[in-house]
Amino acid sequence: MPELPEVETVRRGLAPVMVGASFTTVEQRRADLRFPFPDNFAARLEGRRVEALGRRAKYLLADLDDAQVLVMHLGMSGSFRIEKAGDLASPPPGKNAAHDHVVFGLSTGTRIIYNDPRRFGFMHLIARQDLAGHPLFRNVGIEPLGNELEGALLARLFAGKTTPLKTALLDQTLIAGLGNIYVCEALHRAGLSPRRAAGTLAGKKGQPTERAHRLSEIIRAVLEEAIEAGGSSLRDHRQADGALGYFQHRFRVYDREAEPCPREGCGGTIKRIVQAGRSTFFCAKCQR
């Protein structure tokens, strides 16, 4: 499933094309994806102008000029493809056009095609004033890319928790958008074991420890590095221009079971365990 860097990469690719343009046509080719499309989906979008394209957690948010927000989630295999006027572009390899489920025609002549072989993605229309309180968003945690994510916040969120640190970091009600790949990578860079209790990031009086400060900085750094690399293309992820991400070539631990730990002087071996149903990759020697 695309994680925050992949969704943010898609947002940055779509924004220059979508923002300021209007939907002249919307071709909805099936009744549902993961969930049914909203009633009169195409009719409610046609003629509307996109005023901004944002992101909340792993959701893309297109602000429309009628105070509605088009909420889009990529699911497991969703992707957007941009076809500019005059292009003879075809679906990327492995992306059969039969899986092109929504085609947005823009006032600029550009088409944006949503492709989703597994159909776990979905789209909703929500009134802007209702967005924060909507069930999709009302329990979503803080954004990890902003200044809000700092050691003091991690200490406050995790104080007293005996939950394993990696499991706590994946709790979307605490921190939004973090996924398995980038949590594994951040914990290795921070030298912290995924099995240590999350509460150890706070001192006895709830104050942030050095670990909390270090981890918050590294989480932001890993996410920003991944975004600059276009995300990680393991199965389905492509950028809006069809290019692959390449952060997967920088993985230190994720999917590298039995390989030597890349930390200089460590000499350990990357291990794989299962936590809360998810594979965790780490080095038991240098991650404490």
UniProtKB/Swiss-Prot annotation:
Residue intervals of every FPG-type zinc finger in the record: 252-288
EC number: 3.2.2.23, 4.2.99.18
Binding residue positions for DNA: H99, R118, K161
Any one GO BP annotation for this protein: base-excision repair
Catalytic reaction annotation: Hydrolysis of DNA containing ring-opened 7-methylguanine residues, releasing 2,6-diamino-4-hydroxy-5-(N-methyl)formamidopyrimidine; 2'-deoxyribonucleotide-(2'-deoxyribose 5'-phosphate)-2'-deoxyribonucleotide-DNA = a 3'-end 2'-deoxyribonucleotide-(2,3-dehydro-2,3-deoxyribose 5'-phosphate)-DNA + a 5'-end 5'-phospho-2'-deoxyribonucleoside-DNA + H(+)
Record note on cofactor: Binds 1 zinc ion per subunit.
UniProt entry tagged with the keyword Iron-sulfur: no
Keywords assigned: DNA damage, DNA repair, DNA-binding, Glycosidase, Hydrolase, Lyase, Metal-binding, Multifunctional enzyme, Zinc, Zinc-finger
Cofactor(s) essential for the protein: Zn(2+)
Keyword presence, Transmembrane: no
GO MF, one example: 8-oxo-7,8-dihydroguanine DNA N-glycosylase activity
HAMAP family per UniProt: Fapy_DNA_glycosyl
Function: Involved in base excision repair of DNA damaged by oxidation or by mutagenic agents. Acts as a DNA glycosylase that recognizes and removes damaged bases. Has a preference for oxidized purines, such as 7,8-dihydro-8-oxoguanine (8-oxoG). Has AP (apurinic/apyrimidinic) lyase activity and introduces nicks in the DNA strand. Cleaves the DNA backbone by beta-delta elimination to generate a single-strand break at the site of the removed base with both 3'- and 5'-phosphates.
Protein name stated in the entry: Formamidopyrimidine-DNA glycosylase
Taxon lineage: Bacteria, Pseudomonadati, Pseudomonadota, Alphaproteobacteria, Hyphomicrobiales
